[in-house]
Amino acid sequence: MIGLIQRVKSANVRVEQQIVGQIEQGLLVLLGVKQGDDQSKADKLLQKVLNYRVFADQQGKMNLNVQQAGGSLLIVSQFTLAADTQKGLRPSFSRGASPADAKALYDYFHQQAALHIHTETGQFAADMQVSLQNDGPVTFWLQV
């Protein structure tokens, strides 16, 4: 399971011109689900996302996690993160989970995150437009 996290000052996601998820300060989490991923991996990734120290403390060091910084999560499904780009000029998506399995884990990840922090989401498998104001920019690829 892959989480590409970006520290943001604000972010939103639109489907058919309508905002379906929006946060101010926090993390935009682009979530990719691979074959073989399960709830255990989702739990590990969520703990990493929640506890990764990417926000500045009073001394300006990245010492605070998203909860300590008073932030939120915007979780957006991103199946292309699981792409195999090793060969040729066209990505292969054979490593990605099936749509049904990916949706189940995406929903699980969101439900578990919402137990700990204010969480907004995109719409699974929709054509989405994601807008964000990067803070830094600070971007990390987390994989479990």
From Swiss-Prot:
Subcellular location: Cytoplasm
Gene3D superfamilies, alphabetized: D-tyrosyl-tRNA(Tyr) deacylase
Gene Ontology cellular component list: cytoplasm
Catalytic activity: glycyl-tRNA(Ala) + H2O = tRNA(Ala) + glycine + H(+); a D-aminoacyl-tRNA + H2O = a tRNA + a D-alpha-amino acid + H(+)
GO biological process, one term: D-amino acid catabolic process
Enzyme Commission (EC) number: 3.1.1.96
Record's keyword annotation contains Cytoplasm: yes
Sequence motif Gly-cisPro motif, important for rejection of L-amino acids, location on chain: 136-137
Keywords, comma-separated and alphabetical: Cytoplasm, Hydrolase, RNA-binding, tRNA-binding
A GO molecular function held by the record: Gly-tRNA(Ala) deacylase activity
Pfam families: Tyr_Deacylase
Transmembrane segments: none
RNA-binding listed as a keyword: yes
CDD domains named among the record's database cross-references: Dtyr_deacylase
Domain of life: Bacteria
Domain text: A Gly-cisPro motif from one monomer fits into the active site of the other monomer to allow specific chiral rejection of L-amino acids.
Function: An aminoacyl-tRNA editing enzyme that deacylates mischarged D-aminoacyl-tRNAs. Also deacylates mischarged glycyl-tRNA(Ala), protecting cells against glycine mischarging by AlaRS. Acts via tRNA-based rather than protein-based catalysis; rejects L-amino acids rather than detecting D-amino acids in the active site. By recycling D-aminoacyl-tRNA to D-amino acids and free tRNA molecules, this enzyme counteracts the toxicity associated with the formation of D-aminoacyl-tRNA entities in vivo and helps enforce protein L-homochirality.
Family per similarity comment: Belongs to the DTD family.
The protein's name in its UniProt record: D-aminoacyl-tRNA deacylase
Annotated organism of origin: Haemophilus ducreyi (strain 35000HP / ATCC 700724)
Gene this protein is translated from: dtd
